[in-house]
Curated annotation (Swiss-Prot):
It is found in: Cytoplasm. This is Eukaryotic translation initiation factor 3 subunit K. Component of the eukaryotic translation initiation factor 3 (eIF-3) complex. The eIF-3 complex interacts with pix. GO terms for cellular component: eukaryotic 43S preinitiation complex; eukaryotic 48S preinitiation complex; eukaryotic translation initiation factor 3 complex. PANTHER family: EUKARYOTIC TRANSLATION INITIATION FACTOR 3 SUBUNIT 11, EUKARYOTIC TRANSLATION INITIATION FACTOR 3 SUBUNIT K.
Length: 222
């Protein structure tokens, strides 16, 4: 869905154009930005700059604060881990937002993800599943982050553990994630995450430095 913002002069701009000028701080544009946040949740798209602009407008206009939009923005930030989007969004929250129970729940979920306690995350996510059921692709976005962490942590991993870390998924879903990440089976119970060729190899580099190259510098130090 295309979102156009109508300016005071009667002309229209795209949201991206509006965010590039002083109009981003105009509270008259908040409703259309909030609608844009809802569309991101529905269509599995993401625009961090627009979402941060919404939180900034709430800072300037606390009487216009919308908690449901706040939840959606924070949860969408979680879908873009391991990037630091959530930290930036959290820094823009008002005291009344920070005191909100649902905001605290989302912050707790973020902390759990950041310390890679994925089993606990999925347990908490199940308890709070109504909070993000409107966000298309939420679970798969988290699984993408889990896959990233697994890929940087393990060389091989047991299938049952991998299924647990990915949210207690079934075998067919596991197969799709193995294929997506170019992992491989090893026997019946193991998945190879990193092969020998993937490992970082050390390399000795010898650089020849001529005396003439540093002579002038040494002279200055005398």
């Amino acid at each position: 869905m295309s979102h156009l913002v109508k300016m005071e002069n009667g002309q229209s701009q795209t949201i991206q154009e509006m965010l590039g000028c002083i109009e981003r701080y105009n509270p008259d544009h908040l409703k259309i930005l909030e609608s844009y946040v809802q569309d991101q949740a529905k269509n599995n798209t993401y625009d961090l700059e627009a979402n941060l602009a919404v939180l900034k407008l709430y800072q300037f206009n606390p009487h216009m604060l919308n908690f449901e939009i706040t939840y959606t923005i924070l949860l969408k930030c979680l879908t873009n881990l391991p990037h630091t989007d959530f930290v930036m969004a959290k820094c823009l929250l008002l005291p009344q937002q920070m005191k909100d129970e649902n905001v605290q729940t989302i912050i707790d979920l973020a902390d759990i993800l950041e310390r890679a306690d994925f089993t606990l995350f999925w347990q908490r996510a199940e308890v709070n599943r109504t909070m993000f059921r409107h966000i298309t692709g939420f679970h798969d976005s988290i699984r993408k982050f889990v896959s990233h962490v697994v890929g940087t942590t393990f060389q091989t991993i047991k299938k049952d553990l991998l299924k647990e870390l990915l949210g207690g998924i079934e075998d067919p879903t596991l197969e799709s994630w193995i294929k997506r990440n170019s992992w491989k089976h090893q026997g019946q119970d193991l998945v190879v995450v990193a092969t020998q060729d993937d490992k970082i190899k050390t390399k000795n580099i010898t650089e020849k430095i001529e005396f003439d190259n540093v002579g002038a510098l040494m002279a200055q130090c005398l």
